[in-house]
């Protein structure tokens, strides 16, 4: 059985590293530290030019929950169209109602735009905040998504093994279950063997020091606990280590 490795990235340096490490598919985001937000059009376009493997754009207009208003949905529709215009292969989204159910009317609107633009669709970890994952899986099957990205309702995929295994059974081949959150070379094989998933998702995150010669510590571009002169990047060796472990 061939296991697919999806790597989530939020910069072009990480895209190159993920490809070098052996990724099979890219989830393109901005702000991975916030769980991943919609990437810019320029980022999408350049990623499409660079990548020899499929690239799916995160469609998430803001951090926080997955309860969206009409303005959010309008922006998401435009972003899906932008992903097609940029030359990407798919998109990643999830929309919930206030009670934790999947918002089927709004999700169907987004699916139609994706389908009209021949884009594949991954339903993301919004399912991990659903009120009933079994009902959610049937909803997602009705929508026609290719896969669900999930940690099995847990803080990480390893802790969610039992639910992930149940999700694979419930999906019953209608779509793939993509196990993500905390996947590493140390646990990927066990997650796969105990759940039956055919795809895993990770960032392979690492950091590198800034190449700036002038380092000014007194001015922050964002949160005070973040070092602006440390750059988060995907480590190609971490991706390759997972690939070698699950062969």
From Swiss-Prot:
Question: Per UniProt, what is one GO molecular function of this protein?
Answer: copper ion binding
Name where it mostly resides. cytoplasm
Q: Which Pfam families match?
A: CutC
Keywords of the record: Cytoplasm
What superkingdom does the record give? Bacteria
Give compartment(s).
Cytoplasm
A GO cellular-component term linked to this record: cytoplasm
Using the record for this protein, list the coiled-coil segments as residue ranges, or answer none: none
Task: Please give the family membership noted in the entry.
Answer: Belongs to the CutC family.
Instruction: Enumerate the PANTHER family for this protein.
Output: COPPER HOMEOSTASIS PROTEIN CUTC, COPPER HOMEOSTASIS PROTEIN CUTC HOMOLOG
Q: Please state what the protein is called.
A: PF03932 family protein CutC
- Organism, by scientific name, is Aliivibrio fischeri (strain MJ11) (Vibrio fischeri)
């Amino acid at each position: 059985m061939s296991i697919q490795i999806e790597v989530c990235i939020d910069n072009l340096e990480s895209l190159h590293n993920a490809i070098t490490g052996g990724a099979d598919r890219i989830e393109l985001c901005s702000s991975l530290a916030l769980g991943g937000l919609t990437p810019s059009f320029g980022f999408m376009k350049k990623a499409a030019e660079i990548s020899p493997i499929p690239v799916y754009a995160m469609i998430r207009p803001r951090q926080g929950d997955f309860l969206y208003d009409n303005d959010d949905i309008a922006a998401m529709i435009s972003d899906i169209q932008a992903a097609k215009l940029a030359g990407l292969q798919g998109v990643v989204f999830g929309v919930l109602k206030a009670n934790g159910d999947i918002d089927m009317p709004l999700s169907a609107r987004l699916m139609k735009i994706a389908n009209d633009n021949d884009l594949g669709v991954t339903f993301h970890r919004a399912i991990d905040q659903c009120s009933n994952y079994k009902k959610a899986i049937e909803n997602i099957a009705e929508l026609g998504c290719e896969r669900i990205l999930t940690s099995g309702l847990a803080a990480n995929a390893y802790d969610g093994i039992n639910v992930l295994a149940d999700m694979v059974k419930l999906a019953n081949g209608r779509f793939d279950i993509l196990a993500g959150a905390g996947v590493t070379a140390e646990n990927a094989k066990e997650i796969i063997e105990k759940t039956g998933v055919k795809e895993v998702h990770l960032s392979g995150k690492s950091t590198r020091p800034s190449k700036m010669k002038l380092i000014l510590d007194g001015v922050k571009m964002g949160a005070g606990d973040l070092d602006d002169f440390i750059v988060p990047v995907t480590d190609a060796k971490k991706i390759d280590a997972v690939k070698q472990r699950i062969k």
